[in-house]
Amino acid sequence: MKLKPIEVAEILQKEIANINCLSELEEVGQVITVGDGIAKIYGLANVKSGEVVEFKSGVKGLVLNLENDSVSAVIMGDDNQVQQGDNVKRIKEVLAVPVGKALLGRVVDVFGNPIDGKGDIASKEYRNIEVKAPGIIERASVSEPVQTGIKAIDSLIPIGRGQRELIIGDRQTGKTAIAVDTIINQKQAHLLTNEHDKIYCIYVAIGQKRSSVAQIVRKLEAAGAMGYTIVIAATASEAAALQFIAPYSACSMGEYFRDNGMHALIIYDDLSKHAVAYRQISLLLRRPPGREAYPGDIFFLHSRLLERAAKMSDAKGSGSLTALPIIETQAGDVSAYIPTNVISITDGQIFLESELFYKGIRPAVNVGISVSRVGSAAQIKAMKQVAGSVKLELAQFRELESFSQFESDLDPTTKAQIDHGKRLVEILKQAQYHPFPVEEQIVSIYVGTKKYLHDVPLQKVKEFEDKMLTEIRLNKNDILESIKNEKRITEETEQKLKTFLENFVKAFIKAS
């Protein structure tokens, strides 16, 4: 079959019309040197600090240093896949992570990719990991409580929604246990339909052992708390760059809840390892070291992260993001560089002491130097009614206790005060993974402060508390319900409680 010249011309015209002549302009550089997770790149003239670049192997890098003729990027992955001379492409993006309720119940890496083997995460929304913290006008004052379920904290060092409360102490003093207990304690609110009472939890493990993270996930699953929790893991075996990014990724996931009128709690476990990872990156980038070899912007590293926790104003949806950063001290030294930095950024600290822990006082909270700068604004009225004097009574007890070591003869008043203090300490003790509902905490503290334990032997105080709470749950549940619903102890409720306790104390002493 012969084609006429005019037909050939028509076919050629059609084909030419279908050709896509749009060419994409890519800015490409070249790796000059690579090592220790840092790549020095030549040729990316327009790249910005904090931008993501892509290496030939597909591994991504984060640009942190801009120099006269080159840029330095931290490699977010295996640096063995990046070779000298490799091309590096600018993708004109900053780091973003998936956010939303689809992540609840999952264990993810710093990029939001699932690492729990439960399939893909269907999240449609992405957020940048570095965003500006809410301004002054957008915020509201902290006025609603985050119930941790821990008597010593909810009564003496209350945490409010939108607060930043530091948990600080030596290793193995129960810092993570407090955080996990707080997550488990939110379960009751999630069984109800009222969205306002629900607090979604985010736990970010920075530089932890993989076995420790797995243990925490198993504990949360066993307690039925994983359904409202996201776990982000940047373990010790991962690159320092990933450990550095982890809290910012987690914070963006938490901000989704805050900005949509919901409430979230984020736990950074721990920021000491985060600071060490950033120090490693900074020294490899040849930034000048300062105190304890940390770079000069280490304060800004944590302040820009923790300032993102806030209680939003009504105009912004009244959501909140509460932060519980954890710091590990060396031999109880709270005056070291990172601890003092984070103490000055946060709205209070819960200080855990090894000495108390070894004495069997658990949670090992040192009430003397622990403080909540939000104070009783974050407590319900019923808790204020019973816990107002506890801190003072414990402080007086500590003073008298140290004084009594040198004095053999004590007058009856001092002896009674010491006995009362010992019983207060005993009633504030609590088993791990055993958070109490706030109404039961109030009854326990009421028993301690109103001196119902005077005739109960010290070693039987815990037994007394357990039996008393069991009895009140079974036969006097109306007292607990009244405290829970009214959020205060009415005269009628107090009268019922007094009658119940007087009868119960008599029966308990008689039985023992």
UniProtKB/Swiss-Prot annotation:
The keyword Cell membrane applies. It is a peripheral membrane protein. Its EC number is 7.1.2.2. GO terms for cellular component: plasma membrane; proton-transporting ATP synthase complex. Keywords: ATP synthesis, ATP-binding, Cell inner membrane, Cell membrane, CF(1), Hydrogen ion transport, Ion transport, Membrane, Nucleotide-binding, Translocase, Transport. Produces ATP from ADP in the presence of a proton gradient across the membrane. The alpha chain is a regulatory subunit. It comes from Rickettsia canadensis (strain McKiel). It comes from the Bacteria. GO terms for molecular function: ADP binding; ATP binding; proton-transporting ATP synthase activity, rotational mechanism. InterPro entries: ATP_synth_asu-like_sf, ATP_synth_asu_C, ATP_synth_asu_C_sf, ATP_synth_F1_a_nt-bd_dom, ATP_synth_F1_asu, ATPase_a/bsu_AS, ATPase_F1/V1/A1_a/bsu_N, ATPase_F1/V1/A1_a/bsu_N_sf. Pfam families: ATP-synt_ab, ATP-synt_ab_C, ATP-synt_ab_N. ATP binds at G169, D170, R171, Q172, T173, G174, K175, T176. It is found in: Cell inner membrane. F-type ATPases have 2 components, CF(1) - the catalytic core - and CF(0) - the membrane proton channel. CF(1) has five subunits: alpha(3), beta(3), gamma(1), delta(1), epsilon(1). CF(0) has three main subunits: a(1), b(2) and c(9-12). The alpha and beta chains form an alternating ring which encloses part of the gamma chain. CF(1) is attached to CF(0) by a central stalk formed by the gamma and epsilon chains, while a peripheral stalk is formed by the delta and b chains. It catalyses: ATP + H2O + 4 H(+)(in) = ADP + phosphate + 5 H(+)(out). The record marks S370 as: Required for activity. This is ATP synthase subunit alpha. Belongs to the ATPase alpha/beta chains family.
